[in-house]
Amino acid sequence: MRLTAKQVTWLKVSLHLAGLLPFLWLVWAINHGGLGADPVKDIQHFTGRTALKFLLATLLITPLARYAKQPLLIRTRRLLGLWCFAWATLHLTSYALLELGVNNLALLGKELITRPYLTLGIISWVILLALAFTSTQAMQRKLGKHWQQLHNFVYLVAILAPIHYLWSVKIISPQPLIYAGLAVLLLALRYKKLRSLFNRLRKQVHNKLSV
């Protein structure tokens, strides 16, 4: 049985709650000693993992809609993507304000350049910013064919974000490996599309170098 438009609306409400409830829990944990011995790191990892969860959920929608024959599921993809960006922004903000501190924000640029895992993180965030800004139907019409080209960069984020997570932890634990494995699996489901994009990019580069 296919989902109806009304059911998808309620699904969207549930997804909004899924994006909001972790934030409410985090606020509670900060104020009631619910974090560990290093609360700053706990906040950074929690916000980063939540952003990664929404990224993986966003990537899951298209194959799930196709294989489950639920085309209306596509309507939830933008919502999940925006929550991914929101949590990624909280992740970046927690690093800038809690790790560096308000008085040391001038160091942020240097940190992002000199620490490779931070470089991957900021590249991912900038891409998510561009995708969030252009996620409306109005921007889709305005950009035309370039809209899809831009939004294909989500696959690059799906590669960079798990590497950023793996690189940021001092001791490799199962959790970042699981996220990386899920990202690889979701990208593998798009093997044909990714191969087509790679061949097209290689052809464009070859043509420019041949001029």
Swiss-Prot record:
Localization annotation: Cell inner membrane
Keyword Membrane among record annotations: yes
GO terms (BP aspect): protein repair
TM annotation in the entry: 17-37, 82-102, 116-136, 153-173
Topological relation to the membrane, as annotated: Multi-pass membrane protein
Protein known as: Protein-methionine-sulfoxide reductase heme-binding subunit MsrQ
Function as written in the Swiss-Prot or TrEMBL entry: Part of the MsrPQ system that repairs oxidized periplasmic proteins containing methionine sulfoxide residues (Met-O), using respiratory chain electrons. Thus protects these proteins from oxidative-stress damage caused by reactive species of oxygen and chlorine generated by the host defense mechanisms. MsrPQ is essential for the maintenance of envelope integrity under bleach stress, rescuing a wide series of structurally unrelated periplasmic proteins from methionine oxidation, including the primary periplasmic chaperone SurA and the lipoprotein Pal.
Keywords: Cell inner membrane, Cell membrane, Electron transport, Flavoprotein, FMN, Heme, Iron, Membrane, Metal-binding, Transmembrane, Transmembrane helix, Transport
Coiled-coil segments on the chain, per record: none
GO cellular component assignments: plasma membrane
Molecular function, one GO term: metal ion binding
Cofactor: FMN; heme b
Family per similarity comment: Belongs to the MsrQ family.
HAMAP family: MsrQ (MF_01207)
Native source species: Escherichia coli O139:H28 (strain E24377A / ETEC)
Domain of life, source organism: Bacteria
One Pfam family in the UniProt entry: Ferric_reduct
Subunit relationships: Heterodimer of a catalytic subunit (MsrP) and a heme-binding subunit (MsrQ).
Cofactor annotation remark: Binds 1 FMN per subunit.
